[in-house]
C-alpha cells in the first residue's frame, strides 16, 4: 500500500524559462530559428562529409558523428520546449521525462569523449604524420566513436534509473525547461544521497578524464608546433586545431560549472541560463565554427553549390 505522502506520478510540469506570455511568444520565435539553423548546419556538415572525397579522413569522420550527436541533442529538448511556449499546460509525461533525461545524459557524455577522440586524432596528425594512416585506421576510428556511444548510453541509463527510482511527492514542478537531473532530485521525498554521489562521481570522472586526454594531447601538439621553424608551418599546423579548441573551450567552459556541484535552488536557476548555451547555441555554432575556420569545408561547400561534390560515400 502506498504511503499517503507518496504520489503515483504520471506527468511533470516544466516551469521553463519564463511565465510571461508575451516573452514566451518571442522566445518561441528565437528558439525555433536557432533549432532550424542547428538542423540545417549539422545536416549540411554530415552531407558534405558523406559526399565529398576530400573530406574522407578521420578528422571529418569524427566531426560527422559530432554533428549527428548535436542534432539528437538539440532535438531531444527543443520540440517539447517549443510546444510548451505555446501551451497553457506545460507538462511532460513520466515516460517522456525519463526518455529526455536518459538521452540528455547519454549524449552529453558521448560528446565529451568525441571531443577527446578528435584531440587524439589531431595529436597523431601533427606529432606522427608519417604513421597517421596506420594509427588512425578505419577500425580504430570506429572504436573511438563506438566506445563513447556505449559508455554514454550505459551511464545515461544507470543515472536515469537512479533518478526515477526515487519517490516523488508534493510538487511535481520541474524548475527547468527540460527534465534535468538536479531539479528532479529536488522534488524527491526519499533519500537522494546515493543519487547525488553517483551524479557527482560520473560527472567528475567524465569531465576530468576526457579533459585530461584533450589537455595531454594538446601539450604534445603545442610542443611539436613550437619545434616547427617556419612561421607559415606553425600557422598551418595550429589552424588544423583552432576549430576544435574553440568548441572544446565553449563546451567544457559551460558544463564545468553545472554538474560538478550539489543541486540547490540557486544552482538550478543558474544552470537554466548555462543550459541554454550548451543545449541550443553550442550545437548551432559547432558547424559554423568548423565551416568558417576550415578551408577544406569551405571548398567542399563551394563544390556542393557547383554540383561537383558527389564523389563517393564514406562508411
Curated annotation (Swiss-Prot):
Q: So which stretches are on the Cytoplasmic side?
A: 47-54, 121-139, 218-237, 293-315
Give one Pfam family.
7tm_4
Pull one GO CC term from this UniProt entry: plasma membrane
| The organism's place on the tree of life at top rank | Eukaryota
- Residues annotated as coiled-coil are none
| Molecular function GO terms recorded | G protein-coupled receptor activity; odorant binding; olfactory receptor activity
Q: How does it sit in the membrane?
A: Multi-pass membrane protein
Q: What does this protein do?
A: Odorant receptor.
Q: List the protein's name.
A: Olfactory receptor 5M10
The scientific name of the source species is Homo sapiens
Lineage of the species this protein comes from: Eukaryota, Metazoa, Chordata, Craniata, Vertebrata
Identify the gene encoding this protein.
Answer: OR5M10
Amino acid at each position: 500500500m502506498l504511503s499517503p505522502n507518496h504520489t503515483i506520478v504520471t506527468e511533470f510540469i516544466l516551469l521553463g524559462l519564463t511565465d510571461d506570455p508575451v516573452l514566451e511568444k518571442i522566445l518561441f520565435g528565437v528558439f525555433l530559428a536557432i533549432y532550424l539553423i542547428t538542423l540545417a548546419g549539422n545536416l549540411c556538415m554530415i552531407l558534405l562529409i558523406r559526399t565529398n572525397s576530400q573530406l574522407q579522413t578521420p578528422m571529418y569522420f569524427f566531426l560527422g558523428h559530432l554533428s549527428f550527436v548535436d542534432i539528437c541533442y538539440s532535438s531531444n529538448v527543443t520540440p517539447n520546449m517549443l510546444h510548451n511556449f505555446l501551451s497553457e499546460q506545460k507538462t511532460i509525461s513520466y515516460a517522456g521525462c525519463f526518455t529526455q533525461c536518459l538521452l540528455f545524459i547519454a549524449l552529453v557524455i558521448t560528446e565529451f569523449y568525441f571531443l577527446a577522440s578528435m584531440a587524439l586524432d589531431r595529436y597523431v596528425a601533427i606529432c606522427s604524420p608519417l604513421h597517421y594512416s596506420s594509427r588512425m585506421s578505419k577500425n580504430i576510428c570506429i572504436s573511438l566513436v563506438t566506445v563513447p556511444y556505449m559508455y554514454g548510453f550505459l551511464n545515461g541509463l544507470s543515472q536515469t534509473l537512479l533518478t526515477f527510482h526515487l519517490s516523488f511527492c508534493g510538487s511535481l514542478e520541474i524548475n527547468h525547461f527540460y527534465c534535468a537531473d538536479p531539479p528532479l532530485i529536488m522534488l524527491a521525498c526519499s533519500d537522494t544521497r546515493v543519487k547525488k554521489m553517483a551524479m557527482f562521481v560520473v560527472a567528475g570522472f567524465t569531465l576530468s578524464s576526457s579533459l585530461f586526454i584533450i589537455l595531454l594531447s594538446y601539450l604534445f601538439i603545442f610542443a611539436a608546433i613550437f619545434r616547427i621553424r617556419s612561421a607559415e608551418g606553425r600557422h598551418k599546423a595550429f589552424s588544423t586545431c583552432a576549430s576544435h579548441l574553440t568548441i572544446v573551450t565553449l563546451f567544457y567552459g559551460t558544463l564545468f560549472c553545472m554538474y560538478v556541484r550539489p543541486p540547490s535552488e540557486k544552482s538550478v536557476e543558474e544552470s537554466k541560463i548555462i543550459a541554454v548555451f550548451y543545449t541550443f547555441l553550442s550545437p548551432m555554432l559547432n558547424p559554423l565554427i568548423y565551416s568558417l575556420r576550415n578551408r577544406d569545408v569551405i571548398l567542399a561547400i563551394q563544390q556542393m553549390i557547383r554540383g561537383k561534390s558527389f564523389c563517393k560515400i564514406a562508411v
